[in-house]
Amino acid sequence: MKITFEIEYRTRWGEELVLLLGKRRIALQYADNGIWSGTAECRRADDGASYRYAVECAGACIRTEWYPHRLRLGDLPPLRRLRIRDCWQELPADAPFRSAAFTRGIFARTAAPSRAGRPARGLHPQQGVLLRVVAPDIRPDERLGLASECIDNWQRALPFDDAAFPEWSCALSLPEGAAYKLVVVGRGEVRPLLWEEGENRRWSTPAGDGFLVDASLQPRFPERRWRSAGTAIPVFSLRSRESFGVGEFLDLKLLVDWAAATRQRVIQLLPVNDTTMSGTWEDSYPYNANSIYALHPQFLRLTAAGVAEDDEYRRLRDELNALGEVDYERVNRTKERLLRAAFARCGARTASRADYKAFVETNRHWLLPYAAYRCLRDEYGSADFAQWGPYARYERRKVEAYCMAHGREVGFHCWVQYHLHLQLSEMSRYAHSCGIVLKGDLPIGIGRTSADAWQSPRLFHLDSQAGAPPDAFSAVGQNWGFPTYDWERMARDHFAWWRSRLHKMSEYFDAYRIDHILGFFRIWEIPAGALHGLVGHFNPAMPYEAGELRRMGFDLSDGRYTTPPLDEQTLVAIFGDLADEVRRDCIRGGRLVASCSTQRGAAARYPGDGEHDRRMREGLLTLLDDVLFVEDPYRRGHYHPRIAGGSTHSYRRLPAWLQEAFARLHDDFFYRRHDLFWRDSALRKLPVLLTATDMLACGEDLGMIPDCVPETMRMLQILSLEIQRMPKTAGASFASTADYPYLCVCSTSTHDMTPLRAWWREERTVTERFYREVLHGEGPVPEECEPWLCRRIVEMHLASPAMFAILPLQDWLAMDEGLRAADPEKERINVPAIPRYYWRYRMHLTLEQLLEAEDFNTTLCDMIAVSGRN
């Protein structure tokens, strides 16, 4: 079949259009009136293939479409020639609705697709016209239609077929010049409910030979601000009668049932990747995965993987489920023991199945290195691959030989991943069947001793650490310990590592939270020897050159501004009565001795928990933070102002005029100097990632936000995160929920914050201000955040313009006296200020009990409905 592709596009001098169909590049010819066309020989086997138009100049591609087109031939009559008229697919205003969150989840067609608009096979092969229109925001109880003056004088609409939703099709032929409009009709109805804006369209019988597929129409419907609600909870926090001391993937079925029963549409999870490194509770941190692909074995339902449900199993399950929190070490030890016994019994039988072989083959590029990593970690007793002798450096052939030699152990880890894949895939399909979206979490970092760092070390700066500057979560900044990315190297293959990562994630999730989206603009990079985040710097950045700083009054040649002050006044201020000991044991020749010259060294020298070691350790860490400038590690002689340098002793020692100079250059550096630079940095990365899959992207944009971030997120239609307690307006104590943007996720708190009830207790002055200014309360401020207060706060979020109000389960339950936890302090998931925190929160009631709480569920359902969500 010969297919002629046509598109209207206004080029500039020297530009030309090409069609990219699979591996084919087809040069288009310019006709007139801005129309370009080209012909390609296609077969029925090409049905479903994607293609894009691109603009080239002097042989180089300078612009491509945001969305691909899809070649759909299955609903056409037998043809020798076909013409397809397209329109350029730029990022549209309805981009979020084109995501899998809506097309496979919220607006997915669960009923049999309508065939009303599919008489294409009955049209004459040389005269027919098939309209194809992309309209993703048509709800499941609605259909796209076409109304015309010549179809019952506008009173009846011809419905389109939604078999390829969000693309709609309708085969028809109207009289030349007939007026028509696209409309929305109720499912099973013909009378228009919603009309296109603007003037009537006029039917024009296309010139030329062959059947025409006209995909150039773009709907002009008025914006309808659809909104919904959801719940955020880590998988490990789920509790059911069948779970084994920790939440499991199959527990999501009950959570989906509850969400559907209460009119919610989204379930937001924390990362679910394997974090096994030390084998201790420290592996409970979900953002330090050992693989960006592998799922955590703790989430496996053992009985569904072949573990016998015998007396021992039931005893262990009941013991672990009786605990108020997750016992990470015992749960994972016990699960692995039972899984190994099941693998010995039925692993060989599973390995012979065709679907298992297909899973291994499809995922071979990461699965075998991951399995080898798990084996080597056990063999050498450490996840630090630098200690693995001949395997310290990843070599593909050597690792493949290792896998062959250790086939049974490698096979065990592949078998576990296979069952995890089956169970999470089952939950994803079940959520789709209920119109529920599973929203995943994309961590900004990777584990320093992960399989990813072992397999692809050149993609990372393994000699640095990622973190965050000081903010509301931590006064000394955050040090996550992750290596930072070598973005320049990643860009060489068009960010293939990221595209592969997101593709795997999209097998299970329809939406995702981009953890610390600022990291795609710039990352806070911390020296390897530091523990705090204060002496970090942004990367990429434009640090000041030494001569530039000299002209501002800062001569850095003698090191006075780049090394800690060791004068008597500073030492006494920091160490008090220990100042003499510091001077005697830690300083030689006017410098700190080697063992105290880095924060890691100081912590190692004074590791004890007693008061002396604690004071010495914390004092040295504070002293080492006390500098005004940090030298750039990539460009010697270039310097970054130390973040929040105005709080240092070094700053207080400056004369007033120099303090003013530092304040000016500090504020310019952190709030103005990099705005366009960081925007351009993000625009080189984010569009590639956003178009890698059809998942809905939501950014975590809290903290120190330069102006370029919200601007870029709006441009790319990435949903922002709005937290009432973390206002983005300078000088505001609390954000106004009524002023939230539409394209955002709003929430009462995050996993890094205290839930409502514990927050109410934290700072009485803050909660009193909130009670007076936000809730307009009168009289004494309640000592506790009582159910009626929690409901008021929740209602404010539900009433906001935000597309999604996704609240922690703890804050939903806080509205009900009978369901809320007895101790709100036990509901905290993470404390960012504590570097090694035990992530073990587990909901205090079972999901079965939650489903049986009819009064609460009815109340919640009514609240969501009254708020206009869903």
Question: What is the meaning of each model-derived region?
Answer:
Residues 2-48, 56-77, 128-179, 185-211, ...:
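Aromatic-rich carbohydrate-binding modules that target alpha-glucans
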Residues 51, 180, 231-233:
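Short beta-strand motif preference
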Residues 50, 56-57, 186, 266-275:
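Extended cationic-aromatic binding surfaces that line active-site or macromolecule-binding grooves
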Residues 83-84:
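C2-type phospholipid-binding modules
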Residues 24-28, 51-56, 614-625:
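Short intrinsically disordered, low-complexity coil segments enriched in acidic
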Residues 93-121, 126-130, 174, 199-870:
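Catalytic cores of glycan-processing enzymes that make or break glycosidic bonds
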